[in-house]
Amino acid sequence: MQSRLSRAVGSFTCVFIVLSGVSVAVGPASRADPSDYARPPVPLPVITPTPSDWVPKFPFPFDQTKNRVTDADINAEREMCQWFNAQYDELMRQINRLQFNRITPNGPGVYMGSGSDWDYSIGDLQQQVDIVTTNIDQSVSFLAPRAQALTRSTDHAGNVYFPIYQGESFYLLWQHLSNVNAGIKSHQAAWFTGPSVHRVLRWGSRIHRSNVCE
């Protein structure tokens, strides 16, 4: 009886961890049709940057580092914003739905040997994984050279910072998105990849709330 209770508690905990990631992702769109969230993943188009009239913002204290922002910084963030506006929300919807689907093929919870979570052979789970990881690969490949092109400076205390507004957010979003992809591809448990998903959501939320891409 005690072992059954322990398994039940463990299952509830795992479901809660994954669903908590989902709630962060879809919070702003809570009034949307729930069936929209459950849509199967589809391949996302390759982003081709186009000319735009976007310019960076310099709220305090970034007005103090404006002189350190280069043309390369501006071009990199302009193009990353085009990706963010076009695909970030949909990509995170796909990731969160996949995380949810990974723990539910055999009912709520993850049981050792149940064929869920780390086993992608249930139903069309492998197909979902292939589509989502390909989309993440594509996004990471797009972000990598641009995030790496951002200027990083050091202040008087030896701390590294990005002179351009939200440069750090884009850089860390790229890093953690790469970690999410590696975790899914290596069949890591949903609870193990969950922290990286939450970090992507954190930095994506910061970018969104800053209005830097408007």
Place the predicted regions along the sequence by residue.
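Prokaryotic Sec-type signal peptides and long signal-anchor helices
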Residues: 16, 20, 88, 138, ...
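Second-shell loop/turn segments in exported
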Residues: 74-81, 111-129
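Secretory targeting and sorting signals
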Residues: 1-33
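Cleaved targeting-peptide boundary
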Residues: 33-44
